[in-house]
């Protein structure tokens, strides 16, 4: 027996659906159109999505396994606060999978994306496919991922490969960040090749030009295991990067450093060697500051932190527990959370010390022969 339906009208969550066709036994053969489909109630278990969608296509398969193939579109969608416009593409949907084909959308002033792929609708909700990006807005995309950047803009070009599942996605990004700008400073083009797979974050390439210098990183960090990452800076002008912090920090200088991060990701060990030249802090000039330090068990151990101005040097060494940096209360001598530092000034110009001390103690410019050991309190 064949059931013929003409001018079918239905509604759900404020959306209107129209169709016509036949059903022979359990076999479906309908042309359907959906208008003003508000996505929030349909996708609330997957993402924070707001906006209206239209869908037009063919409904086939059976009543046990209906299949929709057609085209979808939206003038404007908002996903996790990021606005996407001119959403257009093809889609295949059955009870087990949703698969987008050539799903294009615009983002920002000139960003264009095309998605090929989708997600299984049963079991672990597996992700598959890839997306290409052309001039994607960096700030909007980091907001989409829940990451907030301060005073930083750029255009992402490249490809993102998707895998894993909805709760534990695999994401691989390879491309460039063009016109990377921090504050008012155009840094240039950054090379990026990073991946997140089974909660293991891998940095194959990360290079950021900073003036005449370069900031780079490589390695991996298992979110449930160990870390092995190297970060390096060569001739980096600090004044070009500090706007990222979102704070006014009166610090300038050319920085070189190598940092090795290893051990447990949740409690890593850090080995740092750094050198800064032509540094100023609050108008105080220092020829050179260099340091060797480690961090282990959440305690920074300074082997040496030396500030040099002309023929004079000041030295700091000792321990800084991370807890001391996050408290505003008084820590008595002997408290394991308190800083324990030695400040060695031997015939020195003490004006270099504000640049070296962790709580930026302001000292007048003078000379002193002495060795001081004291507990520095936040």
Feature-to-residue mapping (PLM):
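Interface amphipathic segments
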Residues: 1-260, 266-365, 373-378
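Acidic, contiguous internal or C-terminal segments within carbohydrate-active enzymes
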Residues: 370
């Amino acid at each position: 027996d064949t059931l013929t339906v003409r001018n079918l009208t239905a509604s759900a969550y404020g959306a209107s659906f129209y169709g016509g066709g036949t059903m022979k036994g359990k076999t479906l053969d309908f042309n359907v159109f959906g208008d003003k489909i508000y996505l929030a109630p349909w996708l609330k278990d997957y993402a924070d999505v707001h906006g209206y969608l239209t869908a037009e296509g063919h409904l086939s398969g059976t009543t046990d396994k209906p299949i929709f193939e057609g085209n979808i579109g939206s003038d404007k969608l908002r996903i996790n606060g990021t606005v996407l416009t001119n959403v257009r593409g093809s889609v295949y949907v059955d009870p087990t999978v949703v698969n987008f084909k050539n799903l294009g959308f615009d983002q920002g002033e000139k960003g264009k994306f095309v998605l090929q792929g989708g997600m299984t609708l049963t079991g672990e909700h597996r992700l598959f496919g890839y997306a290409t990006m052309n001039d994607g807005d960096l700030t909007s995309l980091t907001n989409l991922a829940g990451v907030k950047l301060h005073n930083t803009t750029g255009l992402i070009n490249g490809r993102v490969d998707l895998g894993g599942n909805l709760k534990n996605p695999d994401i691989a990004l390879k491309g460039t960040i063009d016109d990377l700008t921090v504050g008012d400073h155009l840094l240039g083009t950054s090379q990026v090749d990073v991946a997140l797979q089974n909660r293991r974050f891998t940095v194959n390439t990360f290079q950021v030009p900073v003036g005449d210098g370069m900031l780079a990183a490589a390695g991996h960090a298992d979110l449930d295991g160990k870390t092995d990452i190297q970060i390096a800076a060569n001739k980096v002008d600090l004044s070009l990067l500090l706007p990222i912090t979102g704070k006014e920090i009166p610090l300038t200088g050319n920085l070189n450093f190598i940092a090795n991060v290893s051990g447990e990701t949740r409690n890593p060990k850090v080995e740092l060697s750094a050198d800064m030249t032509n540094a100023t802090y609050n108008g105080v000039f220092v020829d050179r500051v260099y340091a060797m330090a480690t961090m282990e068990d959440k305690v920074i151990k300074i082997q040496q932190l030396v500030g040099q101005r002309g023929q004079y040097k000041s030295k700091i060494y000792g321990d800084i527990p991370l807890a001391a940096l996050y408290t505003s209360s008084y820590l008595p001598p002997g408290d394991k959370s308190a800083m324990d530092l030695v400040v060695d000034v031997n015939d020195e110009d003490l004006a270099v010390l504000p640049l070296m001390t962790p709580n930026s103690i302001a000292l007048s410019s003078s000379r002193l022969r002495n060795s001081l050991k004291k507990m520095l309190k936040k």
